[in-house]
Amino acid sequence: WGHPDLQGNWSNATLTPFERRRGQGPVYTQAEVDQLEGRERSTVQTGSDASDPERGPPPVTGSIGRSYNQIYYDRGDGVARVNGEPRTSLITFPSDGRIPELTPEGARRKREYHDFRSQFGEFDHPELRPLAERCIVFYGSSSASVMGPPMTPTRGYNNNFTIVQDALHVLIMSEMVHDVRIIRLGEPNRLPANVRRWFGDSWGRWEGNTLVVETTNIHPSHGMREQTDKIVHS
């Protein structure tokens, strides 16, 4: 169709964080890469060691600390590289590698959201539990979900995706929770404003070889940083 073919099976498992630490440069030094990747190898090795069958029970107020065995984890074993450079964040724009601060209106919405939730106890009813805990939408290494917008690594497991594409659609299926996100290209009608779905209503357009996706009608419980009107990403 004259555009890049995105189809295939992909993984976004990586040790590179979504956002860069404040004051950090865009590229890791080799010493920093060795430290990060070495720490992950050590974590995997420790988690793979056999447990002592003669160990005593955990303390009454303690945590068992093993909700999953190490075999299930797939955090990646290296940092992301762009043109051979080990990047310190997945965000490349803005240049500081961070999500811009909220606007005054965004900050007001955030306060309103948290003020509303604060009137309830954490376990008052299931709707107050996190979406990821309820296996509805899984959140990864940012306040966005694994399926977006924008898409971010889980930093745990199930980092695989299958992409299917034709002239009018790009379909992304996630291993995590087996969610499917459909990006429509060129369809004339958007959803009514009162119809708000998980992952929203995604519309794509090609700008050269870049697929730019505008997502609206985001479910009110799903928005990134309480933003549910429109998110543009590529």
Summary of predicted features, one role per range:
Residues 1-234:
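PEST-like low-complexity, intrinsically disordered acidic/proline/serine-rich tracts
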